Curated annotation (Swiss-Prot):
GO terms (BP aspect): cysteine biosynthetic process; hydrogen sulfide biosynthetic process; sulfate assimilation, phosphoadenylyl sulfate reduction by phosphoadenylyl-sulfate reductase (thioredoxin)
Natural source organism: Bacillus cereus (strain Q1)
Protein name per its UniProtKB record: Adenosine 5'-phosphosulfate reductase
Residues annotated for [4Fe-4S] cluster binding in this entry: 120-121, 203, 206
EC numbers: 1.8.4.10
GO molecular function: 4 iron, 4 sulfur cluster binding; adenylyl-sulfate reductase (thioredoxin) activity; metal ion binding; phosphoadenylyl-sulfate reductase (thioredoxin) activity
Enzymatic class: oxidoreductase
Location within or outside the cell: Cytoplasm
Gene3D superfamilies named in the record: HUPs
Length: 234
């Protein structure tokens, strides 16, 4: 089994010639390699809808973790319920931070997402994912190379130094148009915020719509140097 500790530059490759551009093959490999010791960390963005549909074909009882920061859009929570109805066998876990919003405010002040967004993300996303991955050998992410400069070198199989794990990224070769084409073809549910200018959807406090021609992640932490929550730093 390929693990963080036994990592070596691997020659695992998947054909990009099929409809899924290697995604289905990557997922099949991942679940065969790690069996029950792998989890999909899903934010329920549109890429997530594609991955959930593919994962359901490979492993209908797969573990899926949603990092519930308690400040997501209502539309996101409603989408999760629709996904549960569409894929009832998937094991969707809504992972909570250890601190409630009130406890966080008492310790660090009100609106931490404004005063110190890195600390807020650490408390409400990074630490919960660390806990979720503690007993796993690998995790799945919906990163695409097209999304941003920080993601353009992502591989199918990655050594993840942040969480000392293996990160599997099946959608690296997909374009934004291909994601939507797949969603429409298979009549998948998706967050209606995508229809009103939100290409990337995170917490309600830190996500704004993006103007025409903008980068897909321009609406995340707008006005701040921060462009990533920290889950995908190497």
């Amino acid at each position: 089994m390929l693990t963080y500790e036994t990592w070596e530059e691997n020659d695992v490759s998947f054909s990009e010639e099929d409809e899924t551009k290697g995604a289905l093959s990557a997922l099949s490999w991942a679940y065969k390699e790690y069996k029950s010791e792998i989890v999909y960390a899903c934010s329920f963005g549109v890429e997530g809808m594609v991955l959930l549909h593919l994962i359901n074909q490979v492993n209908p009882s797969a573990k899926v973790v949603f990092l519930d920061t308690n400040v997501h859009f209502q539309e996101t929570y409603e989408l999760i319920q629709k996904v549960r109805e569409r894929f009832p066998s998937l094991n969707i876990i809504e992972k909570q931070p250890k601190l409630t919003l009130d406890e966080q405010a008492n310790l660090h002040g009100n609106k931490l997402w404004e005063s110190n967004p890195n600390l807020c993300c650490n408390i409400r996303k990074i630490l919960p994912l660390e806990e979720s991955l503690a007993n796993e050998k690998a995790w799945i992410s919906g990163l695409r190379r097209e999304q941003s400069e920080t993601r353009k070198h992502t591989k199918f199989i990655n050594q993840d130094h942040r969480f000392q794990s293996i990160k599997v990224c099946p959608l690296i070769h997909w374009t934004w148009k291909e994601v939507w084409r797949y969603v429409y073809k298979h009549s998948l549910p998706y967050n209606p915020l995508h229809d009103i200018g939100y290409p990337s959807i995170g917490c309600e406090k830190c996500t704004l719509p993006v103007g025409e021609g903008g980068d897909s992640r321009d609406g995340r932490w707008a006005g701040k140097v921060k462009t990533e929550c920290g889950l995908h730093y190497q």
